[in-house]
Amino acid sequence: MDTASTLTRATATLLAALAIQPGTTPPEPIEVAATKATQVVEIVVDAQAGWAIERFDLAGLEFPEVSVLFHETKDACQDNVGLYTGDTIHVCIRADGTYRDKVLLHELGHAWAARNLDDAQRQTFLELRGLGAWNDSGTDWGERGFEQAAEILAWGLLEIPTTPAQISTNDCESLTEAYEILVGAGVPRQQVCG
């Protein structure tokens, strides 16, 4: 059996551009026959979406209106574990648990920051963190304000304490101050720091 036949006979559970908004229920999965033009991609939507909405609600933050798609491979995330594209968040990690939760909150942090921080707030955050650029692709990932903001938001929202090890200056005082600059309120619970 050739690849085209295999793909034609295969089916994928697909929830296309599921918009997750507070108070909504995900629709039932749709069985779609795969064709030569499609890749078989399993998009897993589970209780994690509701959990993320709850994390934002508990912190008093408005959940960003974006589509959230869960994938089994990194293809949709450009070989990363997560990707924010403006109106869609892709989470490309198979494992359940704290790491996947953190990736989801990190990507949602990008969406929240893009919709809620003005230029003055971004500049204040950059100065506080000693960073030179908000989202310059020529700057190392951990030295971009956009990435640090997402990491710090995820750190503050995650219900299981973890340390944002991928960024510098991750002591409790610095992280707490940065979180407060971003959201205008304190961290919802005591967290682990560098």
Per-range role (PLM):
Residues 6, 27-87:
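Auxiliary, metal-adjacent structural segments of Zn-dependent hydrolase domains
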Residues 108-124:
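Catalytic Zn2+-binding segment of zinc metalloproteases
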Residues 60-70, 120-126, 161-170:
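Surface-exposed patches in mature extracellular/periplasmic domains of secreted proteins
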Residues 126-194:
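Metalloprotease/metallohydrolase-associated module, dominated by Zn2+-dependent proteases
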Residues 3-34:
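C-terminal region of N-terminal signal peptides and the immediate post-cleavage residues
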Residues 76-78, 91-93, 173, 192-194:
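Sequence contexts marking disulfide-bonded cysteines in secreted/extracellular proteins
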Residues 88-104:
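Short pre-active-site segment immediately N-terminal to the catalytic Zn-binding motif
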Residues 48, 52, 100-104, 108, ...:
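Stable alpha-helical elements in mature extracytoplasmic
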